[in-house]
Amino acid sequence: KLINNKEMILHVYESASASNSGEVFVATPNQKIIDVVRDFGGKAIKTSENHKTGTDRVFEVFEKNLNSEPNIIVNLQGDMPNIENKAISKLIEHMKKNQCDIGTLASNFSSKNEIDNPNIVKVEVKEKLNDSKFLNALDFFRNNKVSKNILYHHIGIYGFTRRALMMYVKLNRSKLELER
């Protein structure tokens, strides 16, 4: 999809590259996306079509191509053209500083419509979000549910340490994940 005369994936790729967080790869089973990225001068790797999650796809690239490097691997969704490079950098910095094995990002909702929008993933937490600490997520969901806890807009980016990623892909999918 073109946004400002540029494919969506290229906006995401440029943000990831501008974060100066390390090598950027597009992992996809879609040859058209691979061609777009490579024509732009980016790195794209064709992955299996059989993955159940994006994290499984990222692990395939990590396992086959990165020789157990780097220590933190970021899974960034390809349909997020507005992701800021600072957000990517901040996730990695916080994970390193706080020795977190897994991290993700969330933000305040910009409107009530976002809370009711089933296309926007919500994250439920007990504490207010701030820049200086990570919070433990209680749940992630799409539909607006009544909660006595605090809800934020989940941003589709995940960071894993090498060890956590290797463990995560071996886990069985949870009942909640399968239901959704």
Predicted regions and their residues:
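Short phosphate-binding loop-to-helix
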Residues: 25, 31-90
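Conserved core of the sugar-phosphate nucleotidyltransferase
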Residues: 83-172
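A conserved hydrophobic position in a structured secondary element of the catalytic/binding core
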Residues: 28-29, 83, 160, 179
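Donor nucleotide-sugar recognition loop
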Residues: 172-180
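N-terminal glycine-rich phosphate-binding loop and ensuing alpha1 helix
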Residues: 1-28
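Residue-level signal for alpha-helix termini/capping positions
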Residues: 17, 63-67, 96
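Short, high-confidence coil segments that cap the C-terminus of an alpha-helix
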Residues: 21, 68-70, 97-101
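Structured catalytic cores of enzymes that bind and process phosphorylated ligands/cofactors
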Residues: 15-16, 29, 73, 100-105
